[in-house]
């Protein structure tokens, strides 16, 4: 964004230096750079006021002008037809170098013209390198009457080249007013609204339109203005627009562009001859329709697009660009000026679909000030009246509700302490947020904050903490050495090294999936495609990994052993979630050419990798339980879900044959996907450690118990391990038997209990007594679902 310093300074109560402005931009979070693009010789072209102008005694086409250049008076002989007393013009002092019409450079010197000395030159815009600002007739350039004297004329014409790069969250700074407001909060000056944007409120009429989409456009204003002409803008307005990076067109369009760039609210002027019944509203298209816009390109607007229309015709794509049919031409004498608040998500939805980027869309997609729509419209009307004193203004038509309920948030000192490691009292919090334009009120152990209407980037408590942070000098911030790695990063490094050393290749796949890749999943995603396109965020690492595996296998890779660590996305209860996961994919035979024959991959192959992954993560396998799973991407009888209490760690097993056929893979594929966050929460601080071999023998006893067929056998094993016993070392499942009778509702589970004391050898009687005690506890525990006996 181009920001002319000369225009920006108008919004301050007193001037700021370039250094002060750049420092404030740094604190706001804006990357700003200012460089002088003019040669040094043009720095001697300054603004001066013609005090008197009299005809040359020896040349009827020349004028003798007495000019004050801010330091003193000087005599200049001028041949421009518009040279007259009272105007402020560019003055080239002796030593300045100007390029003439033929391209030759001329050095300005003191000289005698027809016997009278000329101590400089009054310049036109074309002579300074701004030919587009020059009027059709030749003449010297005229500055506004309030232009300071002795200032660099080129800097005023082009506006010192301050270039600002705005991040997406700083949409409220995408105007001179927005940027000046933020700078004033962090500088010793106050905000000042220039007189050219002052206005008097005009009468309003509320209209009701059944076709208006109040959801996508809460408030819509329009006003009819007649008695106009699309002549060229005054030179000062052309200069200001050029400095802001816009090409001047005509007075009406230039005013709407200038007001938008200055105040941040896009406006649009329609030729009223193209508007039926002189009435506009915002409507949503029910079906796709073509529309030719101002750039003379025809676009197919998708269904759901928000448009500005009259009773029968589409006159513009709301928040993006008007139609060619309703544009202002040299014959336009009456316009309908529109100002509205379009919801950012509504504009963003179709603006990206048709790939049309405009200054208006840039602002609407980031959010404009809903309470600034009417004041900006009044300011534009005021500027039109100043250029066209005979213009007739009709009452403003309002559609929708202009009431506004500010977002209310609370910020707590303990949250600031946790995030910034700085302690602030409630009084300090109130002072800092109040200085940034927030309305505050002290509550118990918190500060209640009302967010201004223009701050769309403030949505939660952490955003307010960020505001407090940027008003806090670095010297107040705690200085401490950050940890080398975060725990999650360290875990990812460990797992990456472990899996790579185990012979697995690391995959890196895209988070955005197209239609082809996203089809490699039989699970329906809760995420919708991005902006009505075919791309959507992945909710699993499987589709991308399966596509990459298929590509490598089709290129005759002997096998694919791969893993990936990445983010997946989901939507639960209208909230979007992001989670990091680790996934393993194995495909084809393990030993294809071995003399032993083919050893196919199976459920137990991937189960072994999952167990090794848990051990490497520092988690105990005993902390987890396997439970039946019915995930559509896996074989219905070869999959399992891994739980830690009630927390799902992940799912693993053999992929569904239908999914393999979709990917055109002829061999079985086994896959596992685990949550890194759950793994991290279970990681033991001590990590793996050495355990010596026992020196005393163990004794085992078997038990067979009958339970309901739907209960997992591992449930019995875990129940036994849950009983307090100083000798029970481990419990293993020996077998699970279910009769051939399909009507049977029970199954037999055989388990082996291992007993050991690490300080002595247990006697047979001690083992039997402990065995009987544990089986009795188990029978009692499972009394409602089955009976067990040894």
UniProtKB/Swiss-Prot annotation:
Residues 694-790 form the FDX-ACB domain. Signal peptide: none annotated. Its EC number is 6.1.1.20. GO terms for cellular component: phenylalanine-tRNA ligase complex. Residues 39-154 form the tRNA-binding domain. It comes from the Bacteria. CDD domains: PheRS_beta_core, tRNA_bind_bactPheRS. One of its GO terms (biological process) is phenylalanyl-tRNA aminoacylation. It catalyses: tRNA(Phe) + L-phenylalanine + ATP = L-phenylalanyl-tRNA(Phe) + AMP + diphosphate + H(+). InterPro entries: aa-tRNA-synth_II/BPL/LPL, B3/B4_tRNA-bd, DNA-bd_dom_put_sf, Fdx_antiC-bd, Fdx_antiC-bd_sf, NA-bd_OB-fold, Phe-tRNA-ligase_IIc_bsu, Phe-tRNA-ligase_IIc_bsu_bact. One of its GO terms (molecular function) is phenylalanine-tRNA ligase activity. Mg(2+) binds at residues 457, 463, 466-467. Binds 2 magnesium ions per tetramer. Its cofactor is Mg(2+). It is found in: Cytoplasm. Its main location: cytoplasm. Keywords: Aminoacyl-tRNA synthetase, ATP-binding, Cytoplasm, Ligase, Magnesium, Metal-binding, Nucleotide-binding, Protein biosynthesis, RNA-binding, tRNA-binding. Residues 404-483 form the B5 domain. Tetramer of two alpha and two beta subunits. PANTHER family: PHENYLALANINE--TRNA LIGASE BETA SUBUNIT, PHENYLALANYL-TRNA SYNTHETASE BETA CHAIN AND LEUCINE-RICH REPEAT-CONTAINING PROTEIN 47. Belongs to the phenylalanyl-tRNA synthetase beta subunit family. Type 1 subfamily. This is Phenylalanine--tRNA ligase beta subunit. It comes from Chlamydia trachomatis serovar A (strain ATCC VR-571B / DSM 19440 / HAR-13). The gene is pheT.
